[in-house]
Amino acid sequence: MKLSKSTLIATLALTATSTNALVVQNPFSNIQQALKLDLSYDKLTSKLTDTFEQGKANIISTIAKVMNEPLDGLTPEIKNIWSEMLMKFPNSITELNFKAPPKKGKITTQQFDFHVTDAQVPNHKLRIKSTPKDLGIDTVKQYSGYLDVVDEDKHFFYYFFESRNDPKNDPVILWLNGGPGCSSLTGLFFELGPSSIDKNLKPVYNPHSWNANASVIFLDQPINVGYSYSSQSVSNTIAAGKDVYAFLQLFFKNFPEYANLDFHIAGESYAGHYIPAFASEILTHPERNFNLTSVLIGNGLTDPLVQYEYYEPMACGEGGEPSVLEPEECDGMLNSLPRCLSLIESCYESGSVWSCVPATIYCNNGQMGPYQKTGRNVYDIRTMCEGSSLCYSQLEYIDQYLNLPEVKKALGAEVDEYQSCNFDINRNFMFAGDWMKPYQKNVIDLLEKELPVLIYAGDKDFICNWLGNQAWTNRLEWSGSKGFTKAPVKSWKVGKNAAGEVKNYKHFTFLRVFGGGHMVPYDQPENALDMVNRWISGDYKY
């Protein structure tokens, strides 16, 4: 990817971000070469010319207007970071688009079987289509369609599969992929759904699908992700949560046979942001017509301040795999870590984009960049990145399949083109400062309300690695934290085989999955199914 000056920060965001969970497109070394940023900032003041100093305040003020963010509270360190960028290209930084252009779907003459509204979520409508079984994805009852937010022109696509076992009694799971900006249909066809897609673009039955003992909903959110579309834009997790609540309220109104069943929210990667926020939003609605029972987060990004400490240990031989970096590269990561953590702390304290955006840029460059230069898969430390689609060539088959006219017609899809990840959304969230915010606070809220929480992590993932996830769960300050800290780590077995390690106290569980990468159901399908089946049955101790 070539970097123009006018797309500098946008490219930083894209490079710093997402697949199914966090997306990282290109090596960070390219960014630093393009920017030639002095990340130490030690000699910044001496570099700035008098002429530049005169114009700098005006440029920063212009950016503040574009970002709709006041200048109050900027620390000297944060000012220095922005000044470093402005020094390199003072005449062109204001050309940046801090909000990506929305993706507008092509409205077609798709026919839907039902239209559902509810006074509790005004201005929302649910369209439902019975999906033909001869599409070959599964033989169970299945529905697809859209949640429409009429006045705001927002349209969220979903795909529902009934349980293969006992749909009248089995629980319901909502699955969310991350990114931010990646379609949950990736989870469907690549990880845990009823079928995968082969190179001939044909469905292949998955015996380890999570709908073995649960009905599963796959939701494309936020807007402009996957088959979802809008003329609007969204750039933060909290705003997305309100739309997800409206979707669930309407879905369970139309399908009251599922409303009284246990309901779980599961997801991975950036869903470490989504799920705590969405569950917290749901719990503020006592009038809801469904039964939120638990949440499951796999290889998530939830507490960046803790998790960013563990990129160097994971890359440098302390996570269970040999080091993939040279000693001097590991030293470089450690040297940049104190400033990284300081920037994240500023983001936690202020919540301002002025603090949170530089924290993302600096930390991703310093803590992920050296690993990315190796060409290794950020989602599986054991392998090299292959293919053009987020290190897994098979993902290209899914994109091709979901763009087949007959598939789009069968599902009622209303977009010109399906894309597994929308990197404009990724950039929007980054520029809103969402990446580095502390969503572990929402997890505390859930635990105090006695909602069961499972944090699971494949131990071969780099980008949201198990060391960081283990660390933030151990440091989480909630009423049961002392009990959780003292709880023993036990072996988790599937049959007679060791599948991982588990730590539990009351309704909070951390599970390390042996041999799993970022996408545990892809790498360990049988063990992942055992994990979810035991959890939804109420076995929180494993």
UniProtKB/Swiss-Prot annotation:
Its EC number is 3.4.16.5. GO terms for biological process: cellular response to nitrogen starvation; macroautophagy; phytochelatin biosynthetic process; zymogen activation. It comes from Candida albicans (Yeast). The active site is at residues 269, 461, 518. Gene3D superfamilies: 1.10.287.410, alpha/beta hydrolase. One of its GO terms (molecular function) is serine-type carboxypeptidase activity. Residues 1-21 form the signal peptide. It catalyses: Release of a C-terminal amino acid with broad specificity. Substrate binds at residues 464, 519. Induction: Transiently down-regulated during the early events of yeast to hyphae conversion. Pfam families: Carbpep_Y_N (PF05388), Peptidase_S10 (PF00450). PROSITE patterns: CARBOXYPEPT_SER_HIS (PS00560), CARBOXYPEPT_SER_SER (PS00131). The lineage of its organism: Eukaryota, Fungi, Dikarya, Ascomycota, Saccharomycotina. This is Carboxypeptidase Y. Residues 22-127 form a propeptide. It is an enzyme of class 3 (hydrolase). Glycans are attached at residues 213, 291. Belongs to the peptidase S10 family. Involved in degradation of small peptides. Its main location: other. One of its GO terms (cellular component) is fungal-type vacuole lumen. Keywords: Carboxypeptidase, Disulfide bond, Glycoprotein, Hydrolase, Protease, Signal, Vacuole, Zymogen. Disulfide bonds join 182-421, 316-330, 340-363, 347-356, 385-391. It is found in: Vacuole.
